[in-house]
A protein has these predicted regions:
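Terminal, non-catalytic protein-protein interaction segments that mediate quaternary/complex assembly
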Residues: 2-209
Length: 209
């Protein structure tokens, strides 16, 4: 398992934990190929640096593996064996090659980050798009867009995620976005994630509570 989380009283003010509670309390039921889950549509989470730290310290997040994974993504590495060599086995089901997945799009990040650091224009929105409708893929990115904006000398990072497993995947996605923000030579103001579909699988309900 990549990451673990649960809702506790000391975390109730953190917006990430509020989303967990909301899915548990108000989520509707849907059935998919991975099983039954509770879900909500079109939720938004905005996290300050302090709230990010709260999440990272309160979870058993595989930070080293996630750092290695992001580095491989940004280098455009598509060979699953390279991820396995870094101790990352959650891509094994994709076969030997990641087809039109995260590396295809994240390899565009280094030049974009360099451009942002060079220009630092508050009047410009810097955007990375991921995925393409109808493109063959063995794991299409759940992350669809990352936008970098500069407001009064601080970085505002905004992302759109088409689908998010709130209990298992979302903390890791948040950590990836945080690592990306660290490469921008500006203080971070906030990270906002717009969640098209955010869900918790029924077999994780008890653990999440």
């Amino acid at each position: 398992m990549r990451y673990l989380c649960g809702v506790s009283k000391q975390h109730t003010m953190n917006k990430y934990y509020q989303i967990l509670k909301k899915v548990l309390a108000d989520g509707k039921t849907q059935k998919g190929r991975k099983g039954e889950s509770r879900y909500l549509l079109n939720e938004t989470v905005t996290l300050s640096p302090a709230e990010l730290l709260d999440i990272f310290e309160g979870h058993n997040i595989a930070r080293k593996k996630l750092r290695s994974e992001l580095s491989l993504f940004m280098s455009g590495e598509r060979q699953v064996e390279k991820y396995r060599e870094a101790g990352i086995n959650w891509w094994d089901y994709c076969g030997s090659i990641l087809v039109n997945s995260y590396p295809t799009y994240f390899e565009k990040l280094p030049p974009l980050i360099s451009k942002i650091n060079r220009e630092k224009r508050s009047s410009k929105n810097y955007v990375l798009f991921l995925g393409s409708t109808g493109t063959e893929s063995n794991q299409a990115p759940c992350l669809s867009l990352v936008q970098f904006q500069i407001e009064q000398g601080e970085l505002v990072l905004t992302a759109y995620q088409r689908s998010s497993d709130a209990n298992l995947g979302l903390p890791a996605d948040i950590y990836h976005l945080y690592l990306i923000s660290r490469q921008i030579e500006l203080p971070l103001k906030s990270i906002t994630i717009n969640l098209g579909n955010v869900h918790i699988y029924e077999n994780n309900i008890t653990h999440t509570r």
